[in-house]
Amino acid sequence: MLNINKEIAQIETELNELKKLRDEISERIEKLEIKLLKLKALAIPEEEFEEDYEEIIEDVKKSLDKKETVPAEEALKELGLL
């Protein structure tokens, strides 16, 4: 019985460590996705951006909503688009 309890404790510890790593990775992915969107927005020529402003905002919203990592509104504010 002692061995079973010891094994349970080890598995719980490992599981908690993995969950923490998962959360950290998710946070890093989220930050990188926002950074990538910012860089993509900066790479759009100003003339094209002005012409397609609404379309660009909708594309960003759709892209973010599919990934469900960051609310689209939050990301657009972060990009300075709202």
Curated annotation (Swiss-Prot):
Keywords of the record: Toxin-antitoxin system
Stated role: Antitoxin component of a type II toxin-antitoxin (TA) system. Its cognate toxin is RelE1 (Potential).
Annotated protein name in UniProt: Putative antitoxin RelB1
Lineage: Archaea, Methanobacteriati, Methanobacteriota, Methanomada group, Methanococci
